[in-house]
């Protein structure tokens, strides 16, 4: 009887001693899971290059937003990840450096019009296939190349809504999401999403757009709400790195996102020192470190 009581007491004491450590580890994991920090491969000058993973690791990023490759006047993206050799190489290298893929970007549509591409479905399907290869869920589709004024032009707008509905449903059928970037304000984006009416289309929110248009960044986030935002480009235009940026109160951003209940990837696109723009390690290393201080 005494031996049994002694053993029970000993086990209890061990558990009591160990509990704070378990609680700390568990809490740390949850905190890290709430917000992860990624960099864009094309902005660190490693568009679809194998060296992007090592560089992202050296920058202390959690992940990488990979690009589909340049588009220009080509019929298709210059995408290495259609080839089995590169698929295996990229996956193995990402694992080696412990870098997750936050998303796959179709950045070619910054310059090319999504409305003027007859093969838009094939281009998006190529991206969806790449999401499967790299085991991630979010595709990034900027609408910067669409002719300005589409927002008020009923014919252009209806064509765009139709196309986005089609590709959104393609994505949803595969359990994926396409995050679109527009120049609309938050209320305008809510209305656009309602018109598209597809679970496969959400907003890829970009701080720079809100700030450049003189909008209240924190209010815009609240209007969109957590369920309409799939991912965030959490940077401003080039000028200063984030810790010196006077237009963004990053702690207020975190409080806003916390209250919204949003969690996910914060992706660093710009916010480079204008006097040293091509110094990748300085600009992106500084921004990663700052964001981790605030969000993790």
Regions found by a protein language model. Give the residues of each.
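Histidine-acidic metal/acid-base catalytic patches
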Residues: 23-38, 45-62, 173, 186-296
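Bacterial N-terminal signal peptides
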Residues: 9-20
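Active-site acidic/histidine proton-transfer and metal-coordination neighborhood
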Residues: 57, 93-97, 110-203, 211-212
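Bacterial N-terminal signal peptides that target proteins for export
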Residues: 1-9
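Charged helix-capping and loop-helix junction motifs
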Residues: 80-87, 117-125, 153-164, 216-222, ...
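Conserved beta-strand positions in the central sheet of alpha/beta enzyme cores
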Residues: 65, 103-105, 140, 179, ...
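Active-site-proximal loop/turn and secondary-structure-junction residues that shape catalytic pockets
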Residues: 43, 68-70, 107-110, 143-147, ...
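Glycine-rich, proline-tolerant flexible connector loops at the mouths of alpha/beta enzymes
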Residues: 67-91, 143-151
């Amino acid at each position: 009887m005494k031996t049994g009581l002694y053993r029970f007491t000993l086990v209890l004491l061990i558990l009591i001693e160990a509990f704070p450590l378990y609680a700390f580890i568990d809490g740390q994991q949850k905190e890290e899971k709430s917000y992860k920090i990624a960099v864009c491969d094309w902005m660190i000058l490693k568009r679809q290059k194998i060296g992007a993973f090592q560089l992202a690791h050296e920058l202390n990023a959690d992940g990488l937003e990979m690009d589909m490759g340049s588009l220009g006047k080509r019929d298709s993206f210059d995408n290495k990840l259609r080839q089995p050799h590169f698929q295996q190489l990229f996956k193995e290298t990402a694992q080696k450096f412990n870098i997750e893929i936050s998303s796959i970007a179709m950045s070619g549509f910054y310059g090319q019009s999504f409305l003027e591409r007859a093969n838009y479905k094939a281009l998006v399907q190529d991206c969806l296939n790449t999401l499967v290869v790299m085991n991630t869920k979010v595709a990034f589709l900027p609408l910067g190349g669409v002719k300005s004024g589409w927002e008020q032009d009923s014919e252009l707008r209806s064509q765009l809504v139709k196309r986005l509905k089609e590709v959104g449903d393609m994505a949803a059928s595969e359990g994926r999401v396409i995050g679109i970037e527009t120049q609309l304000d938050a209320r305008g984006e809510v209305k656009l999403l309602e018109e598209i009416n597809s679970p496969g289309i959400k907003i890829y929110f970009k701080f720079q757009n809100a700030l450049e248009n003189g909008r209240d960044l924190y209010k815009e986030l609240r209007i969109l709400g957590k369920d309409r935002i799939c991912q965030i480009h959490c940077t401003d235009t080039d000028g200063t790195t984030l810790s010196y940026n006077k237009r963004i109160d990053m702690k207020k951003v975190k409080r806003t996102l916390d209250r919204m209940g949003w969690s996910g990837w914060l992706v660093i696109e710009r916010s480079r020192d204008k006097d040293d723009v091509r110094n990748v390690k300085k600009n992106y290393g500084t921004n990663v470190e700052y964001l981790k201080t605030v969000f993790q």
